[in-house]
């Protein structure tokens, strides 16, 4: 939950609204006001603005070197978008397995009861079956939202990469 909240806050602070930002930057840039374009980038202070600022900062380089600088900055910024995605993926894949482990231990408990009491008393089996169902449900209740959150965060990251490619490279 902490990872999801942190990612929500990050994406809220860094919306992928590159069109409005780029319109302002291009206006200043093509008017020859490079300093104003840089000020717009600094005031925006988003990952896309940082990539564009890196390019403006290195206008004296040749085209290929300028693109390299922007690619390097884009890679730094993409890492900000991808932060904790591996952890979310791990949580999403492991929690159903932990639930399955609980299912197995619950069934083992049920069979242990059968071996000692016999099958005549269904209430004796209920504890093991209940354990199996609760742990399965718990694993799914954590795993499914984690998978949804991971996919959403991954989509936001891809959206950012596409914006960088469209506007800067």
Regions found by a protein language model. Name each.
Residues 2-5, 91, 95-101, 138-142:
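Lipid-exposed faces of alpha-helical membrane segments in multi-pass integral membrane proteins
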Residues 123-150, 154:
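Pore-lining and gate-forming transmembrane alpha-helices of multi-pass membrane transport proteins
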Residues 1-20:
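Hydrophobic membrane-targeting segments
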Residues 14-101, 105-119, 148-169:
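Predominantly long cytosolic amphipathic alpha-helical stalk/bundle segments
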